[in-house]
Amino acid sequence: MSSPWSLFDDHLRLAVRLTPNGGRDALDGIEADGEGEAFLKARVTAVPEKGKANKALMLLIAKSLRIPKSSVSLVSGETARKKILRIDGDPEDLVKKLEIFLG
């Protein structure tokens, strides 16, 4: 399985599959879709209206990685379950944090 992130010079991009109204805010590990593309499974308690679930996702990622919430932005998938997030910072350091958090 491939990894759900792509490294760039000053950031990484993270593929996420978000479940809104998920009962609790949590990152549930890495999975692959039918085409074999990896994504991070995430769920939030926020409802999918007016960007609330997207904001909750970005806050969850920032808290989980212990980075400023301003470092996380949505690249694509505003109204879709599959999203691409941009996380600003040293990509190698961010990957280490993701790997530690996801165990």
From Swiss-Prot:
The entry's protein name is: UPF0235 protein RL4503
Show the InterPro entries listed in the entry: DUF167, YggU-like_sf
Q: Which family does it belong to?
A: Belongs to the UPF0235 family.
Q: Which SMART domains match?
A: DUF167 (SM01152)
> What Pfam families is this protein classified in?
DUF167
The source's domain of life comes to Bacteria
